[in-house]
Amino acid sequence: KRLLADLGIQINEVIPEGGSVNQLKNLPKAWVNLVPYREVGLMTAIYLEKEFGMPYISTTPMGIVDTAEWIHQIEFYINKLAPNILGYKVNYESYIDQQSRFV
């Protein structure tokens, strides 16, 4: 959650974390689903992609390389789906560089 907040990304819902049936109605509002652990949520993400055309990212953001790849995938979908809404494209390369520079 902190990493997404650092990138200026608002989280729609975290399911199943304390989720309720009432929160399920908000799922189609998301631009992309993040499935950090394939064991939990992948089938839901596949269903939402099939039913609502909502893409998902299933890379686990663990370690420098996979976290950078995860951020690049998020950047790709934001720039594909949202530039008309935001009025600009995002570039997270400087964030990735800053976070991995001294590792």
Swiss-Prot record:
UniProt KW keywords: 4Fe-4S, ATP-binding, Chlorophyll biosynthesis, Chloroplast, Iron, Iron-sulfur, Metal-binding, Nucleotide-binding, Oxidoreductase, Photosynthesis, Plastid
InterPro entries hit by this protein: ChlB/BchB/BchZ (IPR050152), Nase/OxRdtase_comp1 (IPR000510)
Pathway in which the depicted protein is active: Porphyrin-containing compound metabolism; chlorophyll biosynthesis (light-independent)
GO biological process, one term: light-independent chlorophyll biosynthetic process
Intracellular or extracellular location(s): Plastid, Chloroplast
ATP-binding listed as a keyword: yes
Reaction catalysed by this enzyme: chlorophyllide a + oxidized 2[4Fe-4S]-[ferredoxin] + 2 ADP + 2 phosphate = protochlorophyllide a + reduced 2[4Fe-4S]-[ferredoxin] + 2 ATP + 2 H2O
Listed cofactors: [4Fe-4S] cluster
EC number(s) reported in the record: 1.3.7.7
GO molecular function, one term: ATP binding
Any one cellular-component term (Gene Ontology): chloroplast
Entry's cofactor comment: Binds 1 [4Fe-4S] cluster per heterodimer. The cluster is bound at the heterodimer interface by residues from both subunits.
Keyword Plastid attached: yes
Function according to Swiss-Prot or TrEMBL: Component of the dark-operative protochlorophyllide reductase (DPOR) that uses Mg-ATP and reduced ferredoxin to reduce ring D of protochlorophyllide (Pchlide) to form chlorophyllide a (Chlide). This reaction is light-independent. The NB-protein (ChlN-ChlB) is the catalytic component of the complex.
Subunit note: Protochlorophyllide reductase is composed of three subunits; ChlL, ChlN and ChlB. Forms a heterotetramer of two ChlB and two ChlN subunits.
Family, similarity comment: Belongs to the ChlB/BchB/BchZ family.
Name this protein carries in UniProt: Light-independent protochlorophyllide reductase subunit B
